[in-house]
């Protein structure tokens, strides 16, 4: 039986299963930090995180999301259950953290909890749908912004490199002129 896993194809099954175990422990730690009891929806969210850890979720791209959710909870009135489940299902935003960095992940986690707490009436308060819907809204909102920032930074770096190359070409041309001038003076 062949399990077609992205990380398994790249790193092998052993490291993939280690990553899944580590993400399970991170998820259990998050639920413990929030103080939520392990019930059905929390275990489903935990197993979702573990399962998708075979497709690229790592500690490095999920911790910023969880930190963002925890920081957002400091100023919100939500209950512990919503916090725990939102944090675990909010790791659907892990690619944002993986591509754009941990600060972007913290912002995404922060916004995710805010959206989860405010769009529950749209679909009757079902938490699973609420988190998926909210993750889609947050990703759709943040991706163009982060892409624009990244493009501007890349353009700025390219402009600096272009100026640097022009400077080096000018220096090289001046050196060649001086060498040629010195050779001409030696011939005379």
Q: Which positions does each model-derived feature cover?
A:
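Pore-lining transmembrane helices
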Residues: 1-154, 188
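Short, highly charged, low-complexity non-transmembrane loops/tails of multi-pass membrane proteins
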Residues: 152-178
């Amino acid at each position: 039986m062949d399990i077609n896993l992205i990380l398994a194809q790249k790193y092998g099954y052993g490291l993939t299963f280690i990553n899944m175990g580590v993400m399970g422990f991170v998820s259990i730690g998050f639920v413990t930090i929030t103080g939520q009891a392990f019930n059905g929806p929390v275990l489903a969210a935990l197993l979702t995180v573990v399962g998708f850890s075979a497709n690229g979720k790592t500690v490095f791209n999920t911790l910023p999301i969880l930190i963002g959710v925890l920081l957002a909870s400091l100023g919100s009135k939500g209950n512990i259950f919503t916090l725990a489940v939102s944090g675990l299902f909010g790791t659907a935003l892990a690619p944002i953290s993986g591509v754009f960095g941990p600060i972007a992940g913290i912002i995404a986690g922060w916004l995710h909890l805010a959206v989860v707490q405010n769009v529950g009436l749209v679909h009757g308060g079902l938490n699973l749908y609420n988190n998926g819907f909210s993750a889609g809204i947050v990703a759709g909102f943040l991706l163009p912004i982060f892409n624009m920032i990244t493009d501007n930074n890349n353009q700025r770096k390219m402009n600096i490199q272009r100026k640097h190359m022009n400077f080096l070409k000018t220096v090289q041309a001046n050196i060649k002129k001086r060498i040629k001038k010195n050779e001409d003076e030696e011939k005379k």
